[in-house]
């Protein structure tokens, strides 16, 4: 009994100082109690101890100077840059110097020791570090952080300021609700102690304590808000980086798609040459013939085919998007042009000038094609043949192989020889007459020629006999919409300015349309009722002044469909197996689906469109500006050909693979590498 009472007395006397020591550190104890469920789990303590042992070896024996050792471990500045190492140092300190660590002794693990004054030292050291971290954070943050009127600037300033590990952890531990509960419990206990008649007022000291608590909580909230803002900024930066990476990958994907299209076109060309070679080798006496010797009859016009041309190797060394050759006529605006192949023969026509022949490999003026009595409005070159249409209502077929000899004979006659030029040397081998007014559009393919004129008719010609075999009346097609218009084609919400369904009478007389101004402000009356024609096999497409694109059957001469959508005269068109692309004075280019008759895409410009050409990758357009527009069909982006280019609006162009020729109102012809 005596010993037990003595022990109880000794226990009570020994615990009293411990409580006295712990009393000043009540806040620290609460902090550690809040941290304990997350930090002081066995798995967490073992993991952090292993990390600490890897970075800072700890002696296996108890340190004789525990507080000094704890100071050395805990003194380095803690930050959010390496929280794992910082937590490991705290855990190792607590494990080693609070008696919670396990040391191997005689093959047995030492049991957990009771809390001693050494724990108080660690707690005191932790409290000092927390106080130091608070002071550093308060010094680094702007004092305006607590001003409610500057919340936005406060968040930005707090996000840039460094936050220590302990300060950030202390701020992020959910103590707000705990503090609220503690304050409410305190107020409730005070209310219980007071009588009902006493005023429910807290003392000055209690109010000051609560004010300090709330101020500390407010700082913690500001820190948490700053940390969340910093995380959001970090996430935004990652999102921006991912978006940039995505854009880069999409651009690479577009390049791959363009390369695929180019490879498909080249493979198509090789396949056709291979088929031609096999065909010729199978013919009697064709063993020694090469595929490139001559083309078979009906091989198709290179003007409208998508197969690329294999250019000379020096073309690859030319700067892309720059005019590398300029041909000056100094006679007037270019009215028509075409070339046989890259670095081949170019034929050009200008206002009030004869048709000229150029050598594109040297840029020299080779000769003239004499015979027309008025301006040539359209022409086309295929191999050694050229067909031109003029306002003199005639079509002429030229043999370009005779140009050199004819020019030599003409020069000899001019020099005074007095000899007549032999008729056999005349490049004009046929003259086709039949239209009653000027010819403004044509297309030919070996034995067949189709022309359109201001007399509002389309004519099909046999080049072997020079006879017109079919006449198609556009006015008749306009007057009979039941046979010429596909009523399933939806009209746009805005009615066309020109009504091709009910306006045949308004086109009975001479046609003229006020052309919208070009980039330089110039304009004129547009008088070409037939703006463009193209055919392939028995399929013929025409664009006319009424704004309609008509599809004809050359076997019957009937228009079986009209594509409606343009609100001004059609100036140019081209089609392939699936698409038809048309340009108009209404400042648009429309891409049509030939299977459904619907508009797939509409390109808008600032000025009227006068010429276009396309392949599977690009649409090249002359749209009333000095620059030539290049539309990438894969990336859906526009670019311009302007360097060393025209000084007046471009009106005519021809494009083949990566080689383009343009003519403008500045009387110049430019050759481009694309």
Swiss-Prot record:
Q: Where are the residues of the annotated region Disordered?
A: 1-25
Which regions are flagged for Polar residues bias? 1-18
Instruction: Cite a GO CC annotation.
Output: nucleus
Q: Which positions carry the signal peptide feature in this UniProt record?
A: none
Q: Which PROSITE patterns match?
A: WD_REPEATS_1, WD_REPEATS_2, WD_REPEATS_REGION
Topology versus the membrane, per the UniProt entry? Peripheral membrane protein
What CDD domains would the database entry show?
A: WD40
UniProt record similarity statement: Belongs to the WD repeat MDV1/CAF4 family.
Protein name from the UniProt record: Mitochondrial division protein 1
The organism encoding this protein is: Malassezia globosa (strain ATCC MYA-4612 / CBS 7966) (Dandruff-associated fungus)
Name the gene: MDV1
């Amino acid at each position: 009994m005596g010993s037990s009472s003595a022990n109880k007395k000794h226990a009570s006397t020994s615990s009293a100082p411990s409580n006295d020591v712990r009393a000043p550190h009540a806040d620290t104890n609460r902090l550690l109690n809040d941290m304990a469920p997350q930090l002081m789990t066995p798995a967490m303590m073992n993991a952090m101890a292993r990390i600490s042992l890897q970075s800072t070896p700890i002696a296996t024996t108890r340190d004789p100077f525990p507080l000094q050792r704890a100071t050395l471990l805990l003194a380095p500045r803690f930050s959010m840059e390496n929280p794992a190492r910082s937590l490991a140092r705290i855990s190792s300190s607590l494990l080693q110097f609070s008696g919670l660590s396990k040391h191997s002794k005689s093959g047995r693990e030492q049991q957990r020791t009771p809390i001693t004054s050494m724990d108080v030292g660690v707690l005191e050291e932790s409290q000092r570090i927390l106080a130091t971290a608070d002071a550093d954070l308060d010094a680094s943050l702007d004092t305006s952080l607590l001003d409610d009127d500057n919340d936005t600037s406060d968040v930005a300033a707090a996000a840039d300021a460094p936050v220590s590990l302990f300060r950030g952890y202390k701020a992020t531990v959910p103590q707000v609700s705990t503090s609220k509960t503690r304050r409410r419990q305190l107020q409730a206990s005070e209310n219980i102690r007071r009588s009902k008649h006493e005023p429910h007022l807290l003392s000055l000291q209690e109010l000051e304590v609560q004010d300090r608590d709330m101020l500390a909580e407010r700082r913690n909230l500001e820190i948490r808000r700053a940390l969340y803002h910093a995380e959001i900024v970090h996430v935004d930066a990652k999102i921006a980086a991912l978006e940039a990476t995505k854009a880069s990958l999409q651009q690479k994907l577009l390049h791959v798609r363009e390369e695929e299209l180019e490879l498909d076109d080249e493979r198509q060309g090789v396949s056709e040459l291979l088929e031609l070679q096999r065909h010729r080798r199978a013919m009697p006496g064709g063993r020694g013939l090469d595929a490139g010797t001559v083309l078979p009859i009906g091989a198709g016009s290179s003007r409208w085919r998508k197969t690329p041309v294999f250019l000379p190797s020096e073309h690859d060394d030319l700067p892309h998007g720059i005019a590398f050759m300029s041909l000056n006529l100094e006679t007037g605006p270019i009215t028509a042009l075409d070339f046989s192949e890259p670095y081949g023969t170019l034929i050009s026509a200008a206002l009030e000038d004869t048709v000229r022949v150029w050598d594109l490999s040297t840029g020299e003026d080779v000769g003239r094609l004499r015979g027309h009595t008025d301006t040539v409005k359209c022409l086309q070159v295929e191999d050694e043949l050229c067909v031109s249409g003029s306002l003199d209502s005639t079509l002429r077929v030229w043999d370009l192989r005779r140009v050199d000899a004819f020019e030599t004979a003409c020069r000899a006659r001019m020099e005074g020889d007095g000899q007549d030029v032999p008729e056999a040397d005349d490049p004009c081998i046929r003259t086709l007459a039949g239209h009653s007014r000027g010819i403004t559009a044509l297309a030919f393919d070996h034995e067949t020629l189709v022309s359109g004129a201001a007399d509002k008719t389309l004519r099909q010609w046999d080049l072997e006999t020079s006879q017109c075999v079919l006449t198609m009346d556009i006015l008749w097609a306009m007057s009979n919409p039941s046979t010429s218009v596909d009523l399933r084609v939806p009209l746009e919400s805005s009615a066309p300015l020109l009504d091709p369904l009910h306006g045949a009478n308004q086109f009975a007389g001479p046609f003229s349309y006020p052309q919208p101004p070009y980039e330089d402000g110039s304009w004129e009356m547009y008088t070409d009722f037939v703006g463009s024609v193209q055919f392939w096999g028995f399929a013929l497409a025409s664009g006319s002044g009424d704004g309609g694109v008509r599809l004809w059957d050359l076997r019957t001469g009937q228009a079986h469909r009209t594509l409606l959508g343009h609100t001004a005269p059609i100036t140019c068109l081209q089609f392939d197996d699936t698409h038809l692309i048309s340009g108009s004075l209404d400042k648009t280019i429309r891409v049509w689906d030939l299977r459904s008759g619907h508009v797939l895409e509409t390109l808008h410009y600032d000025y009227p469109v006068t010429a276009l050409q396309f392949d599977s990758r690009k649409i090249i357009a002359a749209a009333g500006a000095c620059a030539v527009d290049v539309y990438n069909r894969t990336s859906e982006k526009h670019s311009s050909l302007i360097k060393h280019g025209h000084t007046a609006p471009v009106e005519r162009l021809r494009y083949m693979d990566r080689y383009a020729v343009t003519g403008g109102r500045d009387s110049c012809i430019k050759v481009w590498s694309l």
